A protein has these predicted regions:
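Alpha/beta catalytic barrel-like cores
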Residues: 1-149
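Active-site acidic/histidine proton-transfer and metal-coordination neighborhood
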Residues: 3-4, 20, 30-45, 122, ...
Length: 211
């Protein structure tokens, strides 16, 4: 496990700013009160607010054509979790992580769940991605996944989503987000109604697999 920021350091650095913070908070509270707004009620809601960190958010991302990794970028989901834990230490509002599959797939999800528990992190929505082909993929998503005219490609996309559901159950996630890259570029390339019907049929199979 990589070295995280010492929580004592965070506390010490925050303490240096506490006096100014309290002064600004009081001034803002007085201003809001003139408009019949209770700053304490807003603060209470803000303290309860939580944001899920997308696993890809800990990396440098990419361009339309390629990825250019930066120094210190996490190499796998375990390192992404470590970075996510640091974000939560600093913000105190990001206790959940939202993984993207197939990129975050692991061999042992029990191990991954234990790793996240040790970091005091839980899992938000599972993101299923079928908008690009993976190395060695038998059937292509070039012309769509869940709405592809090829039954074999549709079945492959459906199977991936069903796998995502099982992985989510193992991690304790309660939701599935399906990222669909299906579509066409020019008028006349695709029969919209037929494509939509194929998509709905695929989604019904996926929906039936939800717990």
């Amino acid at each position: 496990m990589t070295q995280r920021i010492d929580k004592a350091l965070i506390t010490d650095e925050n303490a240096k700013l506490l006096s100014d913070l309290n002064e600004d908070y009081q001034a803002l509270g007085n201003k809001l009160a003139r408009n019949d707004i209770n700053i304490e009620e807003i603060t209470e809601k803000a303290q309860a607010f939580q944001i899920a960190v997308p696993s890809w958010g800990t990396g440098t991302g990419g361009t339309r054509f390629a990825r250019f990794p930066g120094e210190g970028e996490p190499r796998n989901i375990f390192e992404k979790l470590e970075d996510s834990a640091v974000i939560n230490d600093l913000s105190q509002c990001t206790e959940r992580v939202s993984p993207h599959f197939p990129w975050d797939k692991v061999d042992d999800f029990t191990e991954l769940k234990q790793f996240s528990d040790d970091l005091n992190l839980s899992w938000d929505s599972i993101n299923s991605n079928t908008f690009q082909d993976q190395p060695g993929q038998e059937h292509s998503f070039k012309y769509g996944s869940l709405s592809n005219t090829s039954a074999a490609s549709r079945e492959l996309a459906i199977a991936h989503n069903l796998d995502c559901i099982e992985w989510g159950k193992a991690l304790g996630s309660k939701t599935l987000t399906v990222w669909v890259g299906d579509g066409s570029n020019h008028p006349g390339q695709q029969h919209f109604q037929s494509a939509f019907e194929r998509y709905l049929k695929s989604m019904k199979t996926i929906y039936a697999g939800l717990p």
